[in-house]
Each structure stands twice: as C-alpha cells, then as structure tokens.
Amino acid sequence: MAESELFERGLQARRDVLGAEYVDANLADTDEFMMAFQRVVTEWAWGYAWSRPGLDRKTRSMLNLAILTALGRPDELGIYVKGALATGVSVDEIKEILIHATVYCGTPAGRQAFRAAHEALLAEGVLPRPS
C-alpha cells in the first residue's frame, strides 16, 4: 500500500525529533496488526499535530514532557527527553519543566519523571555519570 502524504510528512517529523534509528526500529518490528497503530501515530500525531505551524518543535517537545509527567508515563518520557534535546531543549529547561510539573502533578509523578529523564540524559551523555 502506498503511504499517504500525511504519513510521509509524519515519518519525517518523527525521525527528525526521535531519531531515525529509533523510529525505523519501531517500524521494522511492526506486523500488519500493529501497523494500524503506527499509521495513526505517524499520520495524526506526527504528520498532523507535530507538523502544524502554530508551535515550533521545541515548544511541542516541552509540552510533551509536561504532559507525559502528568500522565505518569515515565517510559514514554525517557524517549521524549531525547527528542527534546534534538529540538533544542536544554538540560536546565528539562529540569525546570519537571519541577513545574511536579508542583501541579504531585511528587510521585514528578519523581518518576525525574528518574526517567535522568536515565535518558545519562544515556545521551549530557550528564556526568555519578561516581
């Protein structure tokens, strides 16, 4: 099946933010059943929402960090920390977003988010490893 223009635009945005290696690995590990989900995510989240002109990718990345903290999704948050760095969000900005979200979402959600972000930042080599 030929992919739609929305899918292609979304795929490019997704690769730009999350990294081609991560995105391509997800798609390669997808069977026909799960491809329905991949299409929804790629076309609507990335091809539509992430590709709209109203907000830049850095701002969208910052919003995602706060939203994923509020939802209590540290597994996804770690992935989006890498994306935030790719869109120009600094380590200090990530920390401030998580502090602000902790105040409104509660300390359990904040703690999960800080841990996930810390692991992701260590993995990206932008924080020194504790000795």
Predicted region positions:
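Acidic, glycine/proline-rich low-complexity segments that act as flexible tails and inter-domain linkers
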Residues: 1-58, 112-131
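Residues at alpha-helix boundaries and the short loops/turns that link adjacent helices
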Residues: 17-20, 74, 88, 104
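Short alpha-helical scaffolding segments that buttress acidic/His motifs in well-ordered protein cores
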Residues: 41-45, 62-69, 97-102
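Mid-chain, well-packed structural core segment of small domains
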Residues: 62-65, 69-95
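Short amphipathic alpha-helical surface patches that mediate protein-protein
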Residues: 82-85, 99-102, 118
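Short C-terminal domain-edge/linker segments immediately following a structured domain
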Residues: 94-95, 99, 128
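C-terminal structural segments of small proteins and small subunits
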Residues: 105-110
